[in-house]
Amino acid sequence: VKRLSGWDVFMLASETPNVHQHTLKVAVVDTSGFEGVASFERFREVFRARLPVLEPMHYQLVRTPWHLHRPVWYEDAELDLDYHLQRVEVPAPGGRRELDAVIGRIASTPLDRSRPLWQFYFAEGLTGQRIAVIGKIHHVLADGVASANLMARTLQWSDATDEQAGGAFAPPRVRDVMRFAAHDHVARVRTLPSAVRDGVVGAFRLQRRARQRLSHPDLADRFDPPPTFLNHKLSPGRTFASAVLPLAQVKAVSKKLEVTINDLVLTVAAGALSVLHGQVVNT
């Protein structure tokens, strides 16, 4: 059993039927140089072989009885690969737009909290001997960087072994969860003096910053944006759209402007949203 961090608990609490807290990672792979056939069956076989070294994939949320403690991770949960590994077909003609529509549908459904919080989709039907792998992983299981690393490890097909996860699944007993919760509460009590001290220091810091903001009212305006067609009430459905930027050109421009690649891509995206908003307002 493993303790969830405070941030993880916040992410769980902030999830609603309309606001999902999973992240998507997408890899489009050209399989023309592969030895053998890059099939769903092969993908499933490789994934199963890698599971022993993909530790977070075995984590499952367990609620503490009567909510006496925050949820905890059970670290050796049983996996139903028929649920976690899905096969999807990209409709003809199998281009980027069609793949985007499939990704949007995948993003629109929340992960099942009664199972380990991840799924991978193997998308077939793309043009040019390509396949796509779409990973859906909850933020409490892995952040964006960790999710990308997990995705990369699942795509290393060439050196996969036949190692299987050992041990039989045995769900945690209630008394074990309660014992863990009690020990953790005792450990938290020991840190109470420092927590109170940090809280007092933080309160004074917030008060000081509030006074500073009063002398710069223009800063507060940035956190109160005007209403647009985008920032309204959400529904569960998601629409996904992608664009292609030449990496060499992006690197050259970012070097010329002495900014990071992230700075440049975010600026391009913000500019595109501004243009789109203007078009919608005008129509």
Regions from the language model: what does each represent?
Residues 1-7, 24-39, 44-283:
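Soluble acyl-CoA-dependent acyltransferase catalytic core bearing the H(X)4D motif
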Residues 6-7, 11, 16-17, 22:
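Long, Pro/Ser/Thr-rich low-complexity/intrinsically disordered regulatory tracts in eukaryotic proteins
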